[in-house]
Amino acid sequence: MAASTASHRPIKGILKNKTSSTSSRVASAEQPRGSVDEELSKKSQKWDEMNILATYHPADKDYGLMKIDEPSTPYHSMIGDDDDAYSDTETTEAMTPDTLAKKLAAAEGSEPKYRIREQESSGEEDSDLSPEEREKKRQFEMKRKLHYNEGLNIKLARQLISKDLHDDEEDEEMSETADGESMNTEESNQGSTPSDQRQNKSQSS
């Protein structure tokens, strides 16, 4: 019986029928205006915005942000308000390779200023030390310079390596010439008679 009632019902589609939508419009037009306002008031929600502001955005809430109470860094303008003091690059002309090479050549023999200051300050410190401590300090500084002077160490290592290679080449040449001479003597010994070999042995001993 359930199968027979299901077959008598019309199948409803997914799309709305034009007749059903027009009938609902007609019905809504026939209703008085007051009932429409009641329906809208039932469907809509009213928000208490002041309550929301008080709940979600209270005045004392910090939202996890840090408050920095320290004063901002003061700005100090340059000492000397001369226009020339602002930039040296504006007044200087472009550096040419020739002038740069001359300056480098002139500065090559001189030590940097910071090293001169270090030597002056170390001289003042040395006056407080005993002669033994001065000698110990001098030896330490010399060893430190030797240890950290990598350029000199690399040059020395290259010289030693080239010297070793040159010595090895000479040894190989000498061994090759010695091998060649021994082979020549062996060949000559093989070509001679046993009596000649005995004479050669007696002469060599």
UniProtKB/Swiss-Prot annotation:
Composition bias type Polar residues, residue spans: 17-26, 182-205
Annotated positions of the Phosphoserine modification: 44, 87, 121-122, 127, 130
Ranges where the record places region Required for binding PPP1CC catalytic center, displacing metal ions and inhibition of PPP1CC catalytic activity: 147-150
Modification type N-acetylalanine: residues: 2
Assigned keywords, A-Z: Acetylation, Carbohydrate metabolism, Glycogen metabolism, Phosphoprotein, Protein phosphatase inhibitor
Post-translational modification: Phosphorylation on Ser-44 by ATM activates PP1 by dissociating the PP1-PPP1R2 complex. Phosphorylation on Thr-73 by GSK3 activates PP1 by dissociating the PP1-PPP1R2 complex.
GO molecular-function term, one example from the UniProt record: protein phosphatase inhibitor activity
Coiled coil region boundaries: none
Acidic residues biased stretches: 80-91, 121-130, 167-179
One of the GO biological process terms: glycogen metabolic process
GO cellular component, one term: skeletal muscle myofibril
Compositional bias of kind Basic and acidic residues: 35-46, 110-120, 131-143
Residue numbers of Phosphothreonine PTMs: 73, 89, 92, 96
Positions of the UniProt region annotated as Required for binding PPP1CC: 12-17, 43-55
Pfam families in the cross-refs: IPP-2
Stretches for region Disordered: 1-46, 64-205
Domain of life: Eukaryota
Known role: Inhibitor of protein-phosphatase 1.
Similarity remark: Belongs to the protein phosphatase inhibitor 2 family.
Subunit relationships: Heterodimer with PP1.
Protein name: Protein phosphatase inhibitor 2
